[in-house]
């Protein structure tokens, strides 16, 4: 009986803890500088505005500091999927599209990159 209670308890813990853990690893991120650039582009003195979906998507991304992004890029720059020297916009697009598209960025390989023609 005691073993049965332990197994049931383990399954209950796994049922509630594991989904939350999995979603924390798959969240999109955005840097503070990218948020500032977007807000400057669509500010009150400009003609652009973010629609309701873009605002909802922006609040769904995790804001990280620029040094964290730079460290991650430096760590993975020599990997098989190297970035190739292009400039990332400070935003990922794993689940949510690039909100920084208003400042000339587009999604490629789950990372938003600056369009050189913009």
Curated annotation (Swiss-Prot):
Residues 23-84, 116-118 form a propeptide. The keyword Zinc does not apply. Residues 1-22 form the signal peptide. Expressed in leaves, petals and petioles but not in roots and runners (at protein level). InterPro entries: Cyclotide, Cyclotide_bracelet_CS, Cyclotide_sf. There is a cross-link at residues 85-115 (Cyclopeptide (Gly-Asn)). Disulfide bonds join 89-105, 93-107, 98-112. One of its GO terms (biological process) is defense response. Keywords: Disulfide bond, Knottin, Plant defense, Signal. Cycloviolacin-O11 is a cyclic peptide. Pfam families: Cyclotide. The presence of a 'disulfide through disulfide knot' structurally defines this protein as a knottin. Probably participates in a plant defense mechanism. Belongs to the cyclotide family. Bracelet subfamily. This is Cycloviolacin-O11. The gene is Voc2.
């Amino acid at each position: 009986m005691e073993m049965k209670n332990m197994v049931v308890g383990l399954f209950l813990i796994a049922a509630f803890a594991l989904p939350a853990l999995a979603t924390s690893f798959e969240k999109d991120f955005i840097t503070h500088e990218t948020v500032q650039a977007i807000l400057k582009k669509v500010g009150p003195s400009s003609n652009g505005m973010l629609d309701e979906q873009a605002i909802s998507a922006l609040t769904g991304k995790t804001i990280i500091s620029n040094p964290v992004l730079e460290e991650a890029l430096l760590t993975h720059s020599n990997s098989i999927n190297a970035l190739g020297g292009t400039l990332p916009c400070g935003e990922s697009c794993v689940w949510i599209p690039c909100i920084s598209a208003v400042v000339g960025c587009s999604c490629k390989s789950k990372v938003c990159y600056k369009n050189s023609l913009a």
